[in-house]
From Swiss-Prot:
BIR repeats lie at residues 46-113, 177-243, 262-329. It holds the Pfam family zf-C3HC4_3. It comes from Mus musculus. The gene is Birc2. GO terms for biological process: apoptotic process; cellular response to tumor necrosis factor; necroptotic process; negative regulation of apoptotic process; negative regulation of necroptotic process; negative regulation of ripoptosome assembly involved in necroptotic process; placenta development; positive regulation of canonical NF-kappaB signal transduction. Auto-ubiquitinated and degraded by the proteasome in apoptotic cells. Upon stimulation of death receptors, including TNFRSF10B, recruited to receptors and cleaved by caspases. Proteolytic fragments remain associated with the receptors. This cleavage presumably inactivates the protein. Residues 447-537 form the CARD domain. This is Baculoviral IAP repeat-containing protein 2.
Amino acid sequence: MDKTVSQRLGQGTLHQKLKRIMEKSTILSNWTKESEEKMKFDFSCELYRMSTYSAFPRGVPVSERSLARAGFYYTGVNDKVKCFCCGLMLDNWKQGDSPVEKHRQFYPSCSFVQTLLSASLQSPSKNMSPVKSRFAHSSPLERGGIHSNLCSSPLNSRAVEDFSSRMDPCSYAMSTEEARFLTYSMWPLSFLSPAELARAGFYYIGPGDRVACFACGGKLSNWEPKDDAMSEHRRHFPHCPFLENTSETQRFSISNLSMQTHSARLRTFLYWPPSVPVQPEQLASAGFYYVDRNDDVKCFCCDGGLRCWEPGDDPWIEHAKWFPRCEFLIRMKGQEFVDEIQARYPHLLEQLLSTSDTPGEENADPTETVVHFGPGESSEDVVMMSTPVVKAALEMGFSRSLVRQTVQRQILATGENYRTVNDIVSVLLNAEDERREEEKERQTEEMASGDLSLIRKNRMALFQQLTHVLPILDNLLEASVITKQEHDIIRQKTQIPLQARELIDTVLVKGNAAANIFKNSLKEIDSTLYENLFVEKNMKYIPTEDVSGLSLEEQLRRLQEERTCKVCMDREVSIVFIPCGHLVVCQECAPSLRKCPICRGTIKGTVRTFLS
């Protein structure tokens, strides 16, 4: 039975007690001698997970033992724990919480928690000790040999070994694609790339062409030409948790399909300048290929370009530093790595994107939005737009705002302006193509929902003129378009203009259904405003009041009430979208968005802000 909170092991004695348990047990002692190094880093071992709780806060009303048994190890941050198998992180534990139940609730497809629940249903005793539970499952070899079978398909004599129900469901060390890719140094086949196998969840174990899945433990060998690693994985192990998670996410988009393999990227470095202090192998592994110009490279996935390499530069770090949304980067290194690098450079692009609440900007094309620099830097705009290369681009007829935006991005990314007319023209042509595609998408959306488009275009005017907020809010709740929590958050705002701002932005985020209810409600409760917005389409915006005369306390209170994420309606906003400049969502909600929920402009980058 679990110890209560008051019986928690002290920080200084936890490791000693675990050590004494291991020494007294002959089975455990022999096991640790044989696999001491594995246990040192193996989070799939419950004893090792237990040992991570030496610094766990004492006031948490959930025992370390129950957390470790549920698959969690301590991250070292407050009371946050992480599952060694599915990566789920939980914190803010409350009295009465069941770690296993919360694990099942938030990540039901986790193979470890499924195995745990299945075992608890089948076992007559629910209080098996964690040590006995861990070592009651001997290795497949100890139980009478490997369970294997040959596929019955006449087209494939693949050897299949299914350990999914007999072994630890995850290999922590192989949970990242990069770690799996590095195991293929002795891979014997040329027709099936290690990158494809690693992407499909397999790491190399040998002998021959034998590979294993890090999640379900399934093993495959006897690969043949034209085999697809992901398809074979799904065919032989359809219930693998890795495949279930993969099927729920979209396959990431690739900017340059011809450069998606490591070998293809490496071949581009044939004429790489020998004086550059970064090696082609490093760059190719990080997703970059050479563009045959100076030391310029591009990512095959996100199309991000880097140059001016210096001694000590790490391509992976630079990739995460400048292009944190790259899907190849996230898949290979993991979101934690990207977050860590971003945390090292919190003010890297802080001068970007100061958006203004003016009606002109609200109705402007998001792609035409100019990146604004801070006060006193306007002279730099003049300088960067006066080079012969930039002037030549302007003389060709490109939009001045588009050229200015393109040049600013180039300087922020590389530290220098464009060197040749060919370089800038190539980028401008691509930007114009993107703008045309986005315009088509916007027109399609506007045709599908003219009401939503009108609300979006008149957002600032509605902030000022909408006074009957609560009846509309109640109608949205009654129609289940918003939740009770979202309803209460807006209702609790201290002033009507703040309620109106939150309501309008929530309608824009929720989409057509919310816009329709907003329109019908407005027609009933404020016919004048309804006529101006939806019939005459003639909303007037009046410049906002100057709050500088208010007390600092009042200014702070107003700002605090405007800083709620418009998606989750819970956390504080912290992400600025590029290029539109809207600051409306938190760090947790931003990755799931492809378009800004306010202006519907395509999100081409993000900048994290730190509001004080």
